[in-house]
Swiss-Prot record:
Family stated for the protein in its record: Belongs to the RapZ-like family.
Protein known as: Nucleotide-binding protein Cbei_4857
Protein role: Displays ATPase and GTPase activities.
UniProt GO molecular function: ATP binding; GTP binding
Cross-referenced NCBIfam families: PRK05416.1
Chain positions recorded as GTP binding sites: D59, I60, R61, G62
Source organism phylogeny: Bacteria, Bacillati, Bacillota, Clostridia, Eubacteriales
Residues annotated for ATP binding in this entry: G8, L9, S10, G11, A12, G13, K14, T15
Domain of life: Bacteria
Keywords associated with the record: ATP-binding, GTP-binding, Nucleotide-binding
Amino acid sequence: MRFVIVTGLSGAGKTQATRTLEDLGYFCVDNLPPKLISKFAEVCTQSGGNIEKVALVIDIRGGIFFDDFFEALNYLKKNEFKYEILFLEATDEVLIKRFKETRRSHPLSPDGRVLTGITQEREKLREVKNIADIIIDTSKYEIRHLREKINKNYGDHTYPEKQLSITVLSFGFKYGIPVDSDLVFDVRFIPNPFYIPELKQYSGNDEPVKDYVLKQEETVNFIEKLVDMLRYLIPNYIKEGKSQLIISIGCTGGRHRSVAIANEVYERLNKENYNSKIEHRDVAEDLHKGEKKL
């Protein structure tokens, strides 16, 4: 089990680091009192392998417990429990700017100057910084830079293609574009099986419609170009630290063309070992639109 303790200066990026670790599959706990660290570690080891990656955030708001923190670390060492400490920091100037932008007071100086709180906190955390395994100065970092750094140090690089969760989603434009889409593709230029009497009753999940749609020259060319583009985009999304990608493919009603094409794109990505799933938002809409609603 990988056990990461995240700490550092207020305003240095602990919240964003925690979110990134969560996206990487870590079970994250924020502001656990240091006295409970050893007990928490025991619970994790007794999970039967269900918990493989843990990130525990220790904030200066628990500053009165820092003696307990070092006692907990000694306990972990004595019991041969492996842990890593990630320490985040930034310059005084950058931290002051961040506090002013968020209009927050410093936790160690709620009624005074932000700089006073930063100075006190830096001194309190000196010993923790000295024993940290990784120190990240976020002074010149944008969020994406921090995500990249966290991913580089704590991501699973054995199967990098699994780091991005991909959803291929079919939909009908007449029911609206999915609001959480990252990429939207319009396949209404492809011949519509809806106007072929013997195909109208089926959906893109059924062989007759699937065969008709996928044999169209427009479909063949579109899928090849789309998959080729995704092969370029996905590794770059992973490198940037993106954790989820929703690829929405739409036709008029979301029942025939978009369903067949979304299924094919999903199968292609699946064969290339990407962490992908398929959803059909509107495939049944036309079947039920005539039913009376409660």
